[in-house]
């Protein structure tokens, strides 16, 4: 059933947004066999995915997900993974700083992709239970302002692509789609991606699916985070327009180090790093990169007038213990509601 779409892509044409949605619907209802799916993903990658194609895929994926009911504007700060840098869980740690700063966070994540420890791995070590019903996840979002949405539990139709993605062994459009198909429906977002040539494209997709304010980031040293060691390219979506600029960490007083400064390890080791940062015991590069990323995300979440103001707020949220308190609240409530 994917044949007509594969043939159009082979001819060098982009699918319309409607056609992309139709193709994804075929995939997510199990109507495409493995060879068709592999062909579709491969020829799409060779052509290069267009904005309308990614937006059409994303809208259909979101429509197939288990929607999370909640009453607040929400944000997600996450990356595509796949940057191969094996860092500790920077965005997961930053999520608690965001929540303390007044951003409502629905963090959509999975097990490790670019590291040995994905967000669900480290949260499990910290005592967070993430097997939540959509209703319980929404309750946690409204109650404490931060919840973790385990992607496979909310996007069950993705089971139809898991085997083929694994067998292909290279990045496909699903790597880009992962961070933008949040089942809570996002108002704000900070997305880290592995390819700096795609920041404007993904910002355009976020505009198309209804995100109001977003930063799409890719650092010069290859991280899907804002780096404290190198400039980071940013495409910002705000008020319906997209502008691209560079964040230079030195402008905010951060001293460059080496990639080894951010090295992660096992889930237990990464959980210990997160705890030390939130407890105020960790000073230096690991704390710095969390503060820089949380500061930018506080700006994207409209809780700070600028990235600089966001950085100052992020520092206060850690030093006051409020960020740690958000983690403690999440552990307590998921222990009660989770499985």
Model-derived segments and their meaning:
Residues 8, 63-66, 87, 102, ...:
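Glycine-rich anion-binding loops and their surrounding alpha/beta cores
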């Amino acid at each position: 059933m994917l044949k007509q779409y594969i043939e159009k892509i082979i001819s060098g044409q982009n699918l319309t947004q409607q056609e992309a949605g139709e193709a994804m619907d075929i995939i997510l209802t199990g109507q495409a066999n493995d060879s068709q799916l592999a062909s579709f993903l491969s020829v799409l990658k060779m052509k290069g995915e267009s904005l309308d194609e990614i937006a059409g895929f994303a809208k259909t994926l979101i429509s197939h997900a288990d929607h999370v009911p909640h009453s607040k504007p929400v944000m997600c700060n996450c990356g595509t993974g796949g940057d191969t840098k094996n860092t500790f869980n920077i965005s997961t740690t930053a999520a608690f700083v965001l929540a303390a700063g007044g951003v409502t966070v629905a963090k959509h994540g999975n097990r490790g992709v670019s590291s040995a420890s994905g967000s669900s791995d480290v949260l499990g070590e910290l005592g967070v239970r993430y097997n939540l019903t959509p209703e319980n996840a929404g309750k946690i979002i409204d109650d404490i302002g931060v919840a973790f949405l385990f992607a496979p539990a909310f996007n069950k139709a993705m089971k139809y692509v898991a085997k083929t993605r694994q067998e292909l062994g290279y990045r496909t459009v699903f790597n880009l789609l992962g961070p933008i198909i949040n089942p809570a429906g996002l108002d704000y977002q900070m997305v880290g991606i592995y390819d700096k040539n795609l920041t404007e494209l993904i910002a355009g997709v976020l505009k198309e699916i209804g995100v109001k304010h977003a930063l799409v980031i890719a650092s010069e040293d290859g991280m899907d985070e804002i780096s404290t060691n190198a400039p980071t390219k940013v495409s910002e979506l705000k008020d319906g327009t997209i502008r691209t600029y560079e964040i230079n960490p030195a402008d905010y007083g951060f001293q460059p180090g080496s990639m080894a400064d951010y090295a992660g390890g096992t889930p237990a080791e990464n959980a210990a790093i997160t705890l030390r940062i939130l407890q105020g015991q960790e000073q230096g590069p690991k704390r710095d990169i969390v503060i820089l990323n949380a500061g930018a995300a506080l700006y994207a979440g409209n809780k700070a007038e600028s990235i600089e103001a966001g950085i100052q707020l992020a520092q206060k949220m850690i030093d006051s213990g409020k960020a740690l308190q958000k983690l403690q609240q999440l552990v307590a409530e998921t222990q009660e509601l989770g499985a």
